[in-house]
């Protein structure tokens, strides 16, 4: 009888934990739904937050912090692993280009490594915060490159 009770308890507890969403999973799903409702496809996110769509616009860091733009983590959660890197590579490429690196001085490998370093350390930042940083970096408000593209110059500035 005791063995049957333990088996029944084990079965019931598995069913309960399997069917009950946690408050964390509910919050994640709610945020994912908000992002899908606001931006739709990943292409829409890329277009809305692309370097070319930011020309002439300026957002103070306080407003960027309070914005509802998705974070790097939520880009991957909503649109698949690698989405954040895709978005970051576009911006990192823009930064290296504007800072004078041409003719493949900033290789694709350097751009991807820079994007990965940013994502790994700053996964919690939203896209508007990162855009504000990239614009300030381009404006010369942080570290400077010396002769060669160096991912640490960007990550150290961030």
Residue ranges and their predicted role:
Residues 1-158:
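Charged interaction scaffolds used for protein-protein
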